């Protein structure tokens, strides 16, 4: 009997000691896991240091329509997010700024020498004009078209300023050395005579421009042309795809 009790007590002591050791072991492991910082997964792809960082938004700058392809002079500045579609011609020294849309799907659109179409402008043309005047949109030389303006089948003669947020409707005509104030609406067939300042909705005659004011009009266009040169210098004429070609040739062991 005494021997049996001794064996039972020995087993119970052994099991108790073993369970205490197990608890201590797992507790120590849990503390070690909790205090050990989980290693961050290593990046699987390491970008090449010479790789061009593309900013692709899926927007096309030049959109041919049928047989019509937009034409841009070599020294004209057209911002990357501008859309030129169809019968559009951008002449030398001119500039078309960010977000503008020139839609020549129905008729011709021309931006003349040293003229500028500023941010978010929309320029388009109708099949025909109810006034009997040409339905194409013509922006002649040394013309400044302010931001957020809308031009449709209108004619702007040389050395004019169109204020921002203005609307020029079908058949409207702005004669040379004239100014249309910001936020104005020029109704269909309305004509602004040479050397006058107009404004309002609908646009009305305000006063005659002084000789000094008319001389400042082309200077503004030239100043914007010089500003566009700073932007133009940041873009290569044929993009940066040549870097990818050189890298591909190098990977194939082809002499560059």
Swiss-Prot record:
GO terms for molecular function: metal ion binding. One of its GO terms (cellular component) is mitochondrial membrane. Gene3D superfamilies: Hexapeptide repeat proteins (2.160.10.10). One of its GO terms (biological process) is photorespiration. It is a peripheral membrane protein. Belongs to the gamma-class carbonic anhydrase family. This is Gamma carbonic anhydrase-like 2, mitochondrial. The lineage of its organism: Eukaryota, Viridiplantae, Streptophyta, Embryophyta, Tracheophyta.
């Amino acid at each position: 009997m005494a021997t049996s009790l001794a064996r039972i007590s020995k087993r119970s002591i052994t099991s108790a000691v073993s369970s205490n050791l197990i608890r201590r072991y797992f507790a120590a492991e849990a503390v070690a896991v909790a205090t050990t910082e989980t290693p961050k997964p290593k990046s699987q792809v390491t970008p090449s240091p010479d790789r061009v960082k593309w900013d692709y938004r899926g927007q096309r700058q030049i959109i041919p329509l049928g047989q019509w392809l937009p034409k841009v002079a070599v020294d004209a500045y057209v911002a990357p997010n501008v859309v030129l579609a169809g019968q559009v011609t951008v002449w030398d020294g001119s500039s078309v700024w960010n977000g503008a849309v020139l839609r020549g799907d129905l008729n011709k659109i021309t931006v003349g020498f040293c003229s500028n179409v500023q941010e978010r402008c929309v320029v388009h043309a109708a099949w025909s004009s109810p006034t009997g005047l040409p339905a194409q949109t013509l922006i002649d030389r040394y013309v400044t078209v302010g931001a957020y303006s809308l031009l449709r089948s209108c004619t702007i003669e040389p050395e004019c300023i169109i204020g921002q947020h203005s609307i020029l409707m079908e058949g409207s005509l702005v004669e040379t050395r004239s100014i249309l104030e910001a936020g104005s609406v020029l109704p269909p067939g309305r004509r602004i005579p040479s050397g006058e300042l107009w404004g309002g909705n609908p646009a009305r005659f305000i006063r005659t421009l002084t000789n000094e004011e008319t001389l400042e009009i082309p200077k503004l266009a030239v100043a914007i042309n010089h500003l566009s040169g700073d932007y133009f210098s940041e873009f290569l004429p044929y993009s940066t795809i040549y870097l990818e070609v050189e890298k591909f040739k190098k990977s194939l062991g082809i002499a560059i």
